[in-house]
Amino acid sequence: MIQHAGLGYRRDLAEDFLSLSENSPICFIEAAPENWLKMGGWARKQFDRVAERLPLALHGLSMSLGGQAPLDTDLIDGIKEMMRRYDCTFFSDHLSYCHDGGHLYDLLPLPFTEEMVHHTARRIREVQDRLGCRIAVENTSYYLHSPLAEMNEVEFLNAVAREADCGIHLDVNNIYVNAVNHGLLSPEAFLKNVDADRVCYIHIAGHDVETPELLIDTHGAAVLPTVWDLLELAYAKLPTIPPTLLERDFNFPPFAELEAEVAKIADYQTRAGKEYRRAA
């Protein structure tokens, strides 16, 4: 089961994961299934060895939950088989679309409308029915706000999760990035109003500061103090402490620095003084 604090698995870090000490703060790993469904060779052997040691969460990149194109049933079936193979009980994907007759290789924002709530929730239910389990949806960073919006971001997230009866995968860094870039919803208001009982998993990551008014969610830097503060606030507002993962995709520092950030997550979890939640 997925619990406590974890770190995203990346091929560049394989040897570090294989060399983890018994007292490492890393309690689980996360991987994008799209990167591994057809992967073989030495990289797959290393991944398998790490997945034997640590519980695995799957976080998708290309389900296109809000898209108009039919859902990719081959992808869903591949994820289901990967979950079976690795005894994985958790899958999440982004509340976005990324497919329009072909993969767009980006996570594009959805208009916050009632129509899109119903459309996206229906597709999430289809995914859950085919996988045979509940999934979670993640709030994404976005850089263009639709003029069609009928509600704010957290209202949209709550409405989709409620209608689909799915979990919420809360990305704390994305909350902060969107608040700065758009000025529409403060991070504090987001955390106050999110459906706390549905929050079952958390991401935290670093971002790039292009200008004081433009932040880019890159996962390529250390977590900034303002985002750590939001994580602490999230733990204070949630009824239990969800599994929380540090995302780092490139510009890798020495592995000890990543472990130190994961240890900081674990410290915040302990200080919150609440029951730990398992992602399932």
UniProtKB/Swiss-Prot annotation:
Q: Which domain of life is it from?
A: Bacteria
User: What Pfam families does UniProt report for this protein, alphabetically?
Assistant: MbnB_TglH_ChrH
Q: Which InterPro entries match?
A: MbnB/TglH/ChrH, Xyl_isomerase-like_sf
NCBIfam families in UniProt: PRK05409.1
Q: Which family does it belong to?
A: Belongs to the UPF0276 family.
HAMAP family attached to this UniProt entry: UPF0276 (MF_00697)
Which protein is depicted?
Answer: UPF0276 protein NMCC_2101
Which organism does this record belong to?
Neisseria meningitidis serogroup C (strain 053442)
